[in-house]
Amino acid sequence: MNAFLHAISFFTRIPVPWLRPSEEAWRKSVNWYPAVGLVIGLLLWGVHQAGLVLFSPWIAAILTLIAWVYVTGGLHMDGWMDLADGLGSSRPREQILAIMKDSRVGAMGVLAAIMLLLIKAGAVAELAHPGWGSFLIVAPVAARTHVLLSIKLWPYLSADKGIGKGISSGLSVSSIIVSYIIVFAAGWYLGGLQVMTAIFLSLLFALWFSRSVAKKLGGLNGDCYGAVIESSEAVVLLVLVGSWWL
């Protein structure tokens, strides 16, 4: 449970006053990423449902996106922007990594954030009808399950000393397997074939994205993990929007 509290404390703005700091619990907190996604998803679902009662679907979607960024502290979005700045520079590997470490945000990072938020907002607005509330639970959970594979399958950048270093040692294969069993079972229960398709295609995307970035950089780091989460969430939403015919 302490590992779960570490994950909640670091990856959300939710206060955890009873947290007991522990390096071992921090390493094992990676196994609880999908559970953190569930907490985030339930909060977003509540905001979205309240927004739909009071406002139009688009206003509800915008409020949901604001809550999405706020509850995560913009941590994963920061990784998405840093990676966009680095890869968008079209520089050699070492310069890309230097750009990603720079605390300043460049034009490519800003554009990438705007495009991602527009995609998410548009998808949330399109999915604002009865019976589809579960998508706001599925997207954060699926994305944080997919990133476990990114952490496990590709090496961490050896020269990087960021917060993601060392967490792979605490990640167990059994946690990944159990997480996927739960995610797919819950997906089937919540939305049948449409949600299952969204989870599966976002998994394929996350693997492709991770492989492409790792090939370019020689590994992955915390920024890359954040980018995997953000982009996988968007893919889940887009597939759900386009899967009405299933």
From Swiss-Prot:
It catalyses: alpha-ribazole + adenosylcob(III)inamide-GDP = adenosylcob(III)alamin + GMP + H(+); alpha-ribazole 5'-phosphate + adenosylcob(III)inamide-GDP = adenosylcob(III)alamin 5'-phosphate + GMP + H(+). The keyword Membrane applies. InterPro entries: CobS. Its EC number is 2.7.8.26. Pfam families: CobS. It comes from the Bacteria. The chain crosses the membrane at residues 30-50, 51-71, 105-125, 131-151, 167-189, 193-210, 226-246. Pathway: Cofactor biosynthesis; adenosylcobalamin biosynthesis; adenosylcobalamin from cob(II)yrinate a,c-diamide: step 7/7. One of its GO terms (cellular component) is plasma membrane. Belongs to the CobS family. This is Adenosylcobinamide-GDP ribazoletransferase. The lineage of its organism: Bacteria, Bacillati, Bacillota, Bacilli, Bacillales. The gene is cobS.
